[in-house]
Amino acid sequence: MKIGILSRNQSLYSTSRLIEAAESRGHEVKVIDALRCYMNINSEKPQIHFKGEELVDYDAIIPRIGASVTFYGTAVLRQFEMMGVYPVNESVAITRSRDKLRSMQLLSRKGIGMPITGFASKPDDVKDLLDMVGGAPVVIKLLEGTQGIGVVLAETRKAAESVVEAFMGLKANIMVQEFIKEAGGADIRCFVIGGKVIAAMKRQGAEGEFRSNLHRGGSASLVKLTPEERKTAVAAANIMGLNVAGVDLLRSDRGPLVMEVNSSPGLEGIEKATGKDVAGLIIDFIEKNAATKRTKTRGKG
């Protein structure tokens, strides 16, 4: 098969592992920088050009689109969909999961466990907003944040009010969530492919750090999931419409709570913590599904 990987840097661990896994199975692979693509949008023959050449005859596309290029990256992916190329994750599913508020609303509508969450732009009553989520301590997030950037733990009401007011001054949309103390600064990353959890790791925040992101010095280790955690992770990925997803859970006194559903989960942490060939499993999934062009929206989204 001819597989394209939408990635801005082919030396990144995840991208290079996907290239290696695809080539070892005899596939032709090309890394495509979505920002350098340009499109011919027409009703007869939609086209994508890259480095002066038309991109043709691709069987599948693996989107590894960074958060900062979501808009243009998903537009390029949508164009591939319109050309009949099989997307590992569809453009509409990626945009759905990248919007933190939209994804929380979709998960809550389906009864998925999550921390009590408030959302605000310019609240005229910050005290009431904090009361709504159970008071301090609270976690306050900028809606556009990634890798733990723009996430603050406010341990007292006074600190929480100050942070909310500061974020409002940035004209930023903010999310206020209850702090799950019993999680102990750890979360669980469940890697879902095709409706199954194929690997899971526990990420523990560095000493004195409540954020467990590996980019922030957290550590990863193998973890055994409960049946409920497995079921929750699969349901969250399905609600987003993602074939490949990293679902982040917190262990709470009331069961697993979904923090985030990531449409472009990194492979390095999970492969090193579990010893599993996750890149190979993604290529296996493509082999089973791309031939039949099984995509729900066919570029309609």
Swiss-Prot record:
Which of the seven top EC classes does this enzyme belong to?
A: ligase
Q: Which residues bind Mn(2+) 1?
A: D248, E260
Annotated Pfam families: RimK, Rimk_N
GO cellular component terms, alphabetically, are:
cytoplasm
**Residue positions binding Mg(2+) 2:** E260, N262
Q: Print the keywords alphabetically.
A: ATP-binding, Ligase, Magnesium, Manganese, Metal-binding, Nucleotide-binding, Protein biosynthesis
Q: Where does ATP bind?
A: K141, E178, F179, D187, R211, S212, N213
Q: Which residues form the ATP-grasp domain?
A: 104-287
Q: Which GO terms describe its molecular function?
A: ATP binding; metal ion binding; ribosomal S6-glutamic acid ligase activity
NCBIfam families in the cross-refs: PRK10446.1 (NF007764), rimK_fam (TIGR00768)
Family of the protein in this entry: Belongs to the RimK family.
Its name, as the record gives it, is Probable alpha-L-glutamate ligase
Q: What gene is it encoded by?
A: rimK
